[in-house]
Amino acid sequence: MIIAITEIMDLIPHRYPFLLVDRVLKIDPNKSIIGIKNVTVNEPQFTGHFPARPVMPGVLMVESMAQLAAILVAKSLDSTKNKEVFLMSIENTKFRRIVQPGDTMHIHSVIDQQRANVWKFSSKVMVECEIAAESKFTAMIKDKM
């Protein structure tokens, strides 16, 4: 099932310039998800990171993995309209390849464990069949206040 940007914006609260998932290519609710982020030189982070050689900041690769995991949560639950996803921990993060404008980040997220409102994920960013970044996340799902 492909999920376009308009539905992604219905599922998570992030907006430009902090919306870091452009499309979902495949989703298996309660199991896994694959999405993409097209990296372009017009994005604001590249004005300072780094002007002579733009490089996607690692923290934004981590954020893209977390956003994709939140989309997986939203599609796995019956409804998330009254729920929020809060990141609790980030572990074992590794950066293995530079990502730059012109690259397409293929983001993968797998649910490792779900107990009540606590979910654990393994995620990675791939560029041209190489791992660019990988991380493990724990998130909590709470009712909106």
Swiss-Prot record:
It is an enzyme of class 4 (lyase). It comes from the Bacteria. Pfam families: FabA (PF07977). One of its GO terms (cellular component) is membrane. InterPro entries: FabA_FabZ (IPR013114), FabZ (IPR010084), HotDog_dom_sf (IPR029069). Its EC number is 4.2.1.59. Transmembrane segments: none annotated. One of its GO terms (biological process) is lipid A biosynthetic process. Gene3D superfamilies: Hotdog Thioesterase. Its main location: cytoplasm. One of its GO terms (molecular function) is (3R)-hydroxyacyl-[acyl-carrier-protein] dehydratase activity. Involved in unsaturated fatty acids biosynthesis. Catalyzes the dehydration of short chain beta-hydroxyacyl-ACPs and long chain saturated and unsaturated beta-hydroxyacyl-ACPs. This is 3-hydroxyacyl-[acyl-carrier-protein] dehydratase FabZ.
